[in-house]
């Protein structure tokens, strides 16, 4: 007979492998087929209100029907529509959501967010036969890119009562490495508002899954409306890359093997949530993940190691962040460090974030040398003559020694 400790370890291993087997393999081929269809040039970037977006909505509707869903189309004006599918008769449900609109002509919007839609379709296929005690609701939102309009409309006009939702699981910008780094990171946000969801996420934790608070990025995706309605939620993303909102966000650049692997993990998390004995509760006062600072330190280290072209302003900031995060646990510092990572990862937003967030922060901190270096970086992005002059004057003032 096994000794108690060995028996406990054997039981843990058996439980782990049974969990892995409880969901059949997510299909790489099906994920790829969905993304390639949605991101094809014939869809013209799926901008909300266009024929390309309408074709995408029809495609998603047909896929949901083939999966056995009861499908409804929710129009909210301007030729915009949400697609809603439900499987199951149970009153309570887990909601899987992703926006399907894109950036418009010339921008295929494959990772953002054809891949997110592909994930919910494939998860639905894999989970529908698992005899879950809850129903599954798939929500494909329109017009996210212009202000989260589809999801905001849905939470104000839900087709199924929001207080019956076990959780909302939202996907955005999937299938590409954050900042095109060699290592993969799956970011998980939202667990800080529910002890039950945090427990599930912690149980399924793995090194490349980084759990952080949503306040570090702000209301940047469709989880925001559900949070305002106090629906427990998790937001999954692989985050931004060099082609984000650009012509290079093509279907051939999505890593479907990794997308399938992470979808498999998420399927296990959804099963755990579905089988919770008590429904998750939304907490007004968030409990932030204890490993959040370590997650930020890790990303700062990896970026500085891999990005040989890292601008001097970012090297200075990252060095400052790494030193201060060891002793400074304030949310403001964590938000600013995250803003710096996002600015570097999103070239089209870099100038704005550098000028209006990072520079002013270091001015308030009276770190004049760092603020000057940041505004020098902003000059690289500014094309308006008057704005350039204002930046140059600000840099000169910051570089001028102050009287003691």
Stretches with model-predicted labels:
Residues 85, 94-147, 266:
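Alpha-helical metal-binding/catalytic segments enriched in His/Glu/Asp
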Residues 242-292:
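His/Asp/Glu-rich mid-to-C-terminal helical/loop segments that flank catalytic regions of hydrolases
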Residues 34-36, 45-88:
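A non-catalytic alpha/beta surface segment that caps or lines the substrate-entry region
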Residues 280-344:
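Acidic, Ser/Thr-rich low-complexity intrinsically disordered segments
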Residues 90, 132, 141-235, 255-256, ...:
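Metal-dependent peptidase/peptidase-like ectodomains
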């Amino acid at each position: 007979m096994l000794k108690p400790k060995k028996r406990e370890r054997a039981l843990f291993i058996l439980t782990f492998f049974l969990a892995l087997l409880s969901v059949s393999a997510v299909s790489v081929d099906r994920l790829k087929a969905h993304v390639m269809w949605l991101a094809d040039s014939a869809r013209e970037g799926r901008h909300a209100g266009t024929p390309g977006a309408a074709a995408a909505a029809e495609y998603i509707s047909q896929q949901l029907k083939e999966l056995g869903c009861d499908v409804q189309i929710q129009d909210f004006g301007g030729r915009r529509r949400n697609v809603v599918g439900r499987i199951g008769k149970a009153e309570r449900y887990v909601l899987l959501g992703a926006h399907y609109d894109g950036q418009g002509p010339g921008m295929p919007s494959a990772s953002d967010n054809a891949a997110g839609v592909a994930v919910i379709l494939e998860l639905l296929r894999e989970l529908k036969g698992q005899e879950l005690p809850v129903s599954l609701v798939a929500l494909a939102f329109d017009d996210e890119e212009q202000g989260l309009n589809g999801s905001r409309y849905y939470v104000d006009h839900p087709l199924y009562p929001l207080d019956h939702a076990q959780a909302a699981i939202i996907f955005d910008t999937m299938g590409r490495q954050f900042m095109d780094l060699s290592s993969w990171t799956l970011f998980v946000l939202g667990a800080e508002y529910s002890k039950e969801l945090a427990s599930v996420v912690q149980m399924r934790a793995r090194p490349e899954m980084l759990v952080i608070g949503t306040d570090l990025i702000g209301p940047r995706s469709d989880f925001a409306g559900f949070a305002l309605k106090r629906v427990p939620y998790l937001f999954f993303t692989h985050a931004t890359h060099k082609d984000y909102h650009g012509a290079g966000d093509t279907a051939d650049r999505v890593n479907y093997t990794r997308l399938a692997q992470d979808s498999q993990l998420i399927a296990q998390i959804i099963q755990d949530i579905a089988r919770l004995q008590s429904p998750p509760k939304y907490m007004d006062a968030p409990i932030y993940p204890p490993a959040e600072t370590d997650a930020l330190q890790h990303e700062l280290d990896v970026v500085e190691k891999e990005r040989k072209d890292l601008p001097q302003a970012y090297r200075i900031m990252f060095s400052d962040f790494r030193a201060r995060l060891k002793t400074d646990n304030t949310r403001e510092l964590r938000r600013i460090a995250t803003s710096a990572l996002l600015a570097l990862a999103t070239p089209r937003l870099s100038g704005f974030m550098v000028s209006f967030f990072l520079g002013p922060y270091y001015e308030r901190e009276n770190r004049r040398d760092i603020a000057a270096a940041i505004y020098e970086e902003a000059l690289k992005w500014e094309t308006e003559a008057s704005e350039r002059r204002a930046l140059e004057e600000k840099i000169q003032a910051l570089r001028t020694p102050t009287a003691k």
